[in-house]
């Protein structure tokens, strides 16, 4: 077991446009090679596209997409007597949001299309409507946990 103390969670600053912590977290996930201005431009363009296409507030749709994509349970590998079991565990709220944002960006990148902002906008709208690859990933995670319910007593 590690003797080091657990690192303190630093508070995340809200983004300048929407004054929202979640939007800033999304910008951080979209960012590559430290290019934050490019990442923020991509996210804000995606939000503008969502607003134009749906006619609703982009921030509400984004928050609904994150809420829909957040997993409640996941499986973790645990070795017991030479065998590795997939043990279902509840997901902490901060980890759930982190996974949801990670999946949104990951599946946006895999989408066919020209610009990242358009792909991100489409993925956000799909997730808000409970469709798309991100939601499929969450359902897959829940199914894995359900299938391995028998090993729940190995929880740690």
UniProtKB/Swiss-Prot annotation:
This protein is called what? Small ribosomal subunit protein uS7
Q: Fetch the Gene3D superfamilies from UniProt.
A: Ribosomal protein S7 domain
Annotated HAMAP family: Ribosomal_uS7_B
Chain's gene name:
rpsG
Entry's Gene Ontology molecular function annotations: rRNA binding; structural constituent of ribosome; tRNA binding
User: What residue intervals traverse the membrane?
Assistant: none
GO terms in the biological process aspect are: translation
Which family does the entry's similarity section mention?
Belongs to the universal ribosomal protein uS7 family.
